[in-house]
A protein has these predicted regions:
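Membrane-embedded transmembrane helical bundles of large multi-pass transporters/channels
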Residues: 1-44, 54, 144, 188, ...
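Feature of extramembrane
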Residues: 1-359, 513-749, 767-770, 907-918
Length: 920
């Protein structure tokens, strides 16, 4: 393998223009494939493959639960709910939602049989169906008509029955509140009817009296004639009796902040008015969810403009999760562009201070950018070929990471080439005072030799890194799988361009007329001498390392997972502010949570289990609003469907009555009602509910406790049932809880792979398994020390693991092995050049040359990652800060710890070289 890459380097120095042409054709043919990359900034991209996710996919596929909530947010002052004008404005907002044709086309009946939920519609329903004051006139009129029929003789019966029939026309029929109803509503003084709602006033007693009166009418003579009139009236009364159990007060309160539930009418808002739409791409005739989100965002903006125009209230806002996705992504895209530009500028400045040459600086930066383009192109090509690769929020740092590492590699190559030029002049003085004074052939020799020598270390480091990062593909976390693959591809392209395109450019472009002594400082200074002298006291180095590692290990034990969903959002974006408001004030999850019941759902036992589950959900203090399931939908739907009402009334201990209902629910008419909550063979139903899910730890605890309670309820039921929980917010909490495991697994996997690679490479080079294993293990130990230090500092300083920093251990190992291989390779070179010298000389010379290059590389890498501190996203800020610390610690470990531990092997090499020399 080394011969192949060395041959590529030689070819690039012999035919540089051809090399550049080949590379440009390759990159420009590969880059367009980036269009095939699957960008998914939704939470799905973080989901693992487990039972909870599969259950969620089953629910969403069966019940078409890919939805969005479009919400008016209306700010009010305390006491405003006692004003009729406030209720009229809320009615206007809800009417605007119902009148919108786009919303109507894609409505999703999440709230029973309707897609909307608002305080105004709930209040109108209560007035129409439960308010004793509103019903007083028609109840009195109907009671008088019933009494008249009861007192009728044969002559007056016909007339009184006609009056009874006429009076029954005033009985309100349960129906959905329309936009017209909302616009025409003129509420009376809320101070009066809100008190009646609080007193749970309804028509139950009045309706019972009316029902009894109607029943008595058909007990006497002329019963058949009377029954023809009273039958339909009794049906209407029966429906109303069923409607008295609906808790309209809770429906209204669910649109207020959770903390106002005890004194709702004194709430200072805001008030939500909601409409639910389907966001399944197929329903909208598009292929990706992003197109749907853009469409929904446009609707939301139009609704906001209309609401402000009609109400004159400029503080009304509209929120949807589609707006959150598009707004946050647009802002994130701008931010990443700025951060990448800052990174380029900063790295360019740092490189210029090291190179003192704009052309060399430009060479390294441009080639690194080309390597990144090739990386994204290859990722797109792999996606096109069927490899599952999803770019998500956790991969936002990849361009900066590749920029920093690419500059790192380029710096090593250029520094080594300049060192070779200096050595040429020292070995054969010709008065060449600047870099330009060297002949083309002399430059070719220096460029080829310097690149090949650097390539030897880079190749070991790069392939160790690649195998380590590719080991992420064994992770259950999809974002880690994609992250590791893309990083591995990027590192390979950076290495490839560093050993081909970079030397080719340095051959084509004449070097700057830079004095040779300023082109690279390789003189041994006091710092290099002191670091080199540490090889004489390896015991002291090891003891100090252990003493430092002990508190770090204790800090490691204190490291916690601290992933808060809000950290992934830029709260300077208005739509993000609305999202956080809804999450905090209303304790509402971004999408519904589901209790999934499997078994004979439409049965007496199934109904009993359903009621127990609903009671458990309703009594849980962490849930908000009313749970909605198949039986609540049926209870609401029966008021407008006489056939369903008859089937519901006929339910008894007889199994055939339940079978009849199940059969009807699976008909086309029945599926129009039940499809949102009952699967196609009535063996599963879902109960949707809301809960506070922004805090991942609280959500994980909530899910664990509630799952256990629901499992107990299922076990105690009379039938064979299973009750499970699912929902996007619950899965995100699980993913977050798995972050700690992922950190351990990813770090452990990469550590094991790096150890195997180091052992394997050294075994091949030493042609001895034991010696190779020993060298590989000793090189590996300082890397693990760095990991302990990094995690220890994170624990001691309060840094927490999140979706970004979960990879810090693996990245630290990847960067650390680069430094370790560079230094050990240089140490072995120095031994080969001067086997009779003292170990201090080998170490000092290596630190003064390669060590300086490593310091410069660490400076550029740290500089590149430091720009992440300018991000508005906390995870990216933390990632940048922690990685800067990791870089510094990796450099310290390589320079101070590794030489002292590696010296015994260097002495063995020196003895071997001396023995070979004597034998010759």
């Amino acid at each position: 393998m080394k011969r192949i890459f060395d041959g590529m380097t030689s070819f690039s120095t012999e035919r540089p223009k051809t090399t550049i042409a080949i590379i440009l054709v390759f990159i420009f043919s590969l880059t367009p494939n980036a269009m095939f990359i699957n960008f998914d900034n939704s939470e799905d991209a973080f989901f693992p493959d487990n039972e909870t996710v599969r259950l969620l996919n089953e629910v969403e596929d069966e019940y078409q639960a890919s939805i969005d909530f479009i919400r008016f947010i209306d700010d009010i002052d305390s006491g405003d709910l006692y004003k009729a004008s406030t209720w009229e404005q809320l009615a206007t907002l809800e009417a605007i939602l119902l009148e919108n044709q786009d919303l109507q086309e894609y409505q999703y009946p999440l709230f029973g049989i309707q897609p909307n939920s608002g305080m105004a519609s709930a209040a109108i329903q209560w007035h129409n169906l439960q308010d004793p004051v509103t019903a007083e006139s028609w109840i009195s009129e109907l009671q008088l008509a019933i009494d008249a029929v009861a007192a009728s003789d044969n002559e007056s019966l016909t007339g009184n029955l006609a009056n009874l029939s006429a009076a029954s026309s005033s009985i309100p029929s349960p129906s959905l509140v329309s936009a017209t109803d909302l616009r025409n509503w003129r509420p009376e003084d809320p101070n009066l009817w809100l008190d009646r709602i609080d007193e749970e006033a309804n028509l139950s007693s009045n309706l019972s009296v009316l029902s009894a009166g109607l029943t008595n009418l058909i007990q006497g003579p002329n019963s058949s004639e009377i029954a023809m009139v009273t039958g339909p009236i009794s049906g209407k009364i029966g429906m109303l009796i069923g409607m008295q159990s609906i808790d309209y007060r809770s429906m209204m309160i669910s649109n207020l902040p959770a903390e106002d539930s005890t004194e709702p009418w004194d709430s200072n808002g805001p008030v939500l008015t909601t409409f639910v739409v389907v966001t399944e791409p197929g329903e909208h005739g598009v292929e990706v969810i992003g197109d749907v989100q853009e469409k929904v965002s446009e609707w939301a903006e139009d609704l906001a403009s209309q609401a402000k125009s009609e109400t004159g209230d400029s503080e009304i806002s509209v929120f949807s999760f589609s707006q959150l996705a598009t707004g946050q992504n647009a802002n994130l895209g701008k931010e990443l562009g700025i951060l990448n530009s800052l990174c380029l500028l900063l790295l360019g400045f740092i490189l210029w201070t090291k190179f003192r040459s704009k052309r060399d600086t430009a060479n390294v930066l441009v080639l690194t950018v080309f390597a990144i383009l090739a990386t994204y192109g290859m990722a797109g090509l792999l996606t096109l070929l069927g490899v599952k690769m999803v770019f998500n929020a956790a991969m936002n740092s990849i361009p900066i990471l590749l920029l920093a590492i690419g500059v790192d590699y380029g710096l090593h190559v250029v520094a080594r080439i300049r060192e070779e030029l200096q050595d040429q002049e020292k070995a054969d003085p010709q008065g060449r005072g600047t870099l330009r004074d060297f002949s083309i052939e002399a430059r070719r020799i220096a460029i080829r030799k310097g690149t090949i020598l650097t390539s030897a270390a880079l190749m070991v480091a790069i392939f160790t890194d690649m195998v380590g990062f590719l080991s992420f593909r064994f992770s259950s976390q999809q974002f880690l799988v994609s992250f590791g693959t893309v990083i591995a591809i990027g590192l390979f392209f950076i290495y490839l361009l560093s050993i081909t395109a970079l030397p080719a450019l340095m051959m084509i472009i004449p070097p700057k007329k830079l004095p040779l002594e300023k082109s690279g400082k390789n003189d041994i200074g006091p710092v290099s001498s002191w670091i080199g002298s540490l090889v004489n006291v390896p015991q002291k180095v090891i003891v100090v390392t252990i003493l430092i590692s002990v508190p770090m290990f204790l800090g490691f034990q204190q490291l916690e997972v601290g992933f808060d969903t809000r950290d992934n959002f830029d709260d300077s974006v208005p739509v993000v502010q609305d999202f956080l408001l809804i999450a905090d004030e209303f304790q509402s999850s971004p999408s519904p949570l589901y209790a999934v019941l499997d078994g004979d759902v439409i049965s007496q036992e199934g109904r009993a289990l359903y009621d127990s589950v609903v009671m458990e959900l309703s009594d849980n203090p962490k849930t908000t609003g009313l749970p909605i399931g198949i039986w609540s939908v049926l209870e609401e739907s029966r008021t407008t469907n006489s056939e369903l009402d008859a089937l519901m009334n006929g339910l008894s201990d007889d199994e055939s009555s339940w079978s009849a209902l199940e059969t009807w629910l699976l008909t086309e008419e029945g599926r129009n009602i039940s499809s949102g909550n009952l699967n196609s063979d009535a063996s599963q139903t879902v109960i949707s509910f809301q809960a506070a899910t922004l805090d991942w730890q609280a959500t994980a605890d909530f899910e664990s406790d509630l799952s256990a309670n629901l499992a107990d309820i299922a076990d105690e039921s009379d039938g064979d049932f299973i009750v499970q929980l699912s929902g996007r917010s619950l899965i995100l909490a699980q993913v977050t809880a798995d972050v700690a495991d992922s950190a351990v697994i990813s770090t452990g996997t990469v550590a094991a792979v790096i150890l195997l690679m180091l052992v394997g490479i050294n075994t091949v080079r030493q042609k001895d398994v034991i010696r190779g294993a020993a060298r590989g293990f000793v090189t590996w130990i300082p890397l693990m020390v760095v990991v302990v230090w990094v995690y220890g500092i994170m624990g001691l300083t309060g840094y927490q693991l999140n979706s970004q920093t979960v990879t810090i251990g693996a990245l630290t190992l990847g960067l650390g092995v680069d430094y370790a291989v560079h230094l050990t390779t240089r140490l072995e070179e120095e031994v080969e050049h001067a086997p009779s010298a003292d170990p201090v000389v080998w170490s000092t010379k290596s630190v003064a040359t390669t060590g300086r290059a490593m310091f410069g590389a660490a400076l550029t890498t740290a500089g590149g990652f430091s720009v992440l501190n300018f991000s508005s996203l906390v995870p990216l800020q933390l990632f940048g800060q922690v990685f800067v610390v990791a870089i510094i610690l990796a450099l310290v470990s390589s320079l101070f710890v590794l030489p002292a531990m590696y010296t015994p092997f260097l002495k063995q090499d020196a003895q071997k070289y001396l023995a070979n020399t004597e034998s010759e």
